[in-house]
From Swiss-Prot:
The gene is Matcap1. Keywords: Carboxypeptidase, Cytoplasm, Cytoskeleton, Hydrolase, Metal-binding, Metalloprotease, Protease, Zinc. The lineage of its organism: Eukaryota, Metazoa, Chordata, Craniata, Vertebrata. Tyrosine carboxypeptidase that removes the C-terminal tyrosine residue of alpha-tubulin, thereby regulating microtubule dynamics and function. Also able to remove the C-terminal phenylalanine residue of alpha-tubulin TUBA8. Recognizes adjacent tubulin dimers along the same protofilament. This is Microtubule-associated tyrosine carboxypeptidase 1. Binds 1 zinc ion per subunit. It comes from Mus musculus (Mouse).
Length: 467
């Protein structure tokens, strides 16, 4: 599901922050320093966006990540990647301070006023035309299906030997090779709270997720949600059975595109996923493109912290918002799985997760996510990026009483810690706030409900995350 904070693909150095007047709009131009030029952006969409790339969706068309991050000179990352490390505590490094499923498979795109287009994802994955591979493509094993079969035929005693299409981006692997234990107590507590109430994960999924939706049901739900956000016709919708995540935003043929995993589109979970991908990532991306810090240079000039963990934390909270039982199960189990993977082989990790998840297919997926980037999974090791979800959730909940959530969204892809310093410089005309955030009293009540349901202790969060 989604997955960068910082910079936009269209880059130009912003003006210096004015002494006492609001920032003005700035035209964006293609960046010449990050791979091939982009397709022209449709004028009807206004400001350009760059969204994320799913691991199974790389095609010969050019993909752009949702606000790129320079891992090396021109590598791409998932939309909400950032230079933030989940192992760090306290303030992060800054730049310089401011100077002053098939109703209509395939076919042509629909006009802006029509229903969202749904197309089956093509599997003819070609080699990337970029100088550097997308992180999710580079870290997705090319022999995953074969290794899965070997693993299950061995009765879970074989450690998969993964192969990858592209050379491993070592800077990424090194960045995410260390797992954090900072919030392990909270992760285990959330998992145990779910199991106490439902007995098993499978019961939890059946009770809170509801039935899997058909393609037409997905289409209808997406259309209704887009109407709520006023973005019908802005986003193409595609369906896939090959995503490691539940959903992902990207750009295909210069159109904002939402790919949805058919195997995870459940009756009561789909709208939460839409709040995550569209209501959070997409709208914050739209708002970010209007700000003077939309580029790498702009973020440095304004001294901004990475947008993560705020970006994914906020989106993850929105995934469970308004549920009767808003358990943070997925974020907690990802956090736990990655911590354990750092000390276990693949088969050991698979057996360890049996205490929480009986379904072997679900366990396999969690283990693959945690072991991404490894070739010999008999060795301990992890890919720790997915710990950002719970990390971001807990940081936002810790400061939920003081965060200006509407301004946080309007300012684009920024950390909650930078909101106050950016308040005088933000371009707030025509920014977009998701429909579920307009009633702030109700929104804050839901955050309290999430705290209570997941048994999160205010004092403990204060100790772990002091001011």
């Amino acid at each position: 599901m989604v997955l960068d904070s910082g910079t936009q693909v269209y880059e130009q150095a912003p003006p210096r922050p004015p002494a006492g007047s609001p920032s003005q709009h700035h035209k964006l131009k293609p960046s010449n320093g990050n791979g091939p030029p982009l397709y022209p952006w449709p004028e009807s969409l206004g400001m350009p966006l760059a969204l994320a790339v799913p691991s199974a969706l790389q095609q010969q068309t050019m993909w752009q990540t949702f606000s790129k991050l320079h891992l090396e000179q021109s590598s791409h990352m998932r939309r909400s990647e950032s230079t933030y490390s989940v192992n760090s505590t306290g303030r992060r490094g800054r730049g310089k301070a401011p100077i002053g499923r098939g109703c209509d498979p395939g076919g042509t795109l629909r006009p802006a006023a029509s229903l969202p287009h749904i197309a089956k994802i093509r599997k003819d994955v070609g080699s990337s035309s970029s100088k550097s591979p997308c992180m999710l493509v580079a870290l997705r094993p090319t022999n995953m299906d074969q290794e899965r079969e070997k693993f299950f035929q061995s009765h879970y005693t074989y450690n998969p030997q993964f192969e990858y299409q592209e050379p491993m981006p070592m800077s990424v692997l090194e960045k995410y090779q260390e797992a954090s234990a900072q919030f392990m107590n909270q992760a285990v507590g959330i998992i145990e709270a779910v199991l106490e109430k439902f007995g098993t994960y499978e019961n939890f999924e059946a009770a809170t997720g509801g039935q899997l939706l058909t393609k037409c049901q997905i289409w209808s739900t997406v259309r209704k949600y887009m109407q709520k956000e006023g973005c019908v016709g802005e986003i193409v919708v595609q369906l896939s059975e090959d995503l490691l995540s539940q959903a992902v935003m990207m750009v295909e043929n210069s159109r904002p595109t939402l790919a949805i995993n058919l195997t995870g589109a459940r009756q009561y979970w789909l709208e939460g996923m839409l709040r995550h991908e569209i209501g959070t990532h997409y709208l914050r991306g739209v708002n970010n493109s209007r700000q003077p810090w939309h580029s790498t240079e702009g973020r440095l000039q304004y001294g901004l912290q990475p947008a993560n963990p705020t970006e994914e934390g906020l989106a993850s909270l929105h995934s469970v918002l308004f549920r009767k039982q808003p358990f943070l199960w997925r974020a907690a189990l990802l956090y736990y799985t990655i911590h354990q993977a750092a000390h276990m082989s693949f088969r050991q990790l698979f057996q360890d997760l049996a205490q929480y998840v009986q379904d072997e297919g679900v366990r396999w997926e969690y283990c693959v996510r945690a072991k991404r980037g490894q070739t010999d999974t008999s060795q301990p090791g992890c890919f720790s990026k997915d710990q950002v979800y719970l990390d971001g959730i807990l940081r936002i909940l810790r400061h939920r009483h003081t965060i200006d959530f509407q301004l946080l969204t309007s300012l684009g892809k920024v950390s909650y810690e930078d909101v106050e310093q950016l308040r005088p410089y933000g371009v707030l005309d025509n920014t977009r706030v998701p429909h579920f955030m307009k009633d702030l009293e109700r929104y804050r009540q839901q955050l309290e409900h999430i705290m209570t349901t997941n048994r999160l202790d205010e004092a403990e969060l204060g100790r772990l995350l002091p001011d």
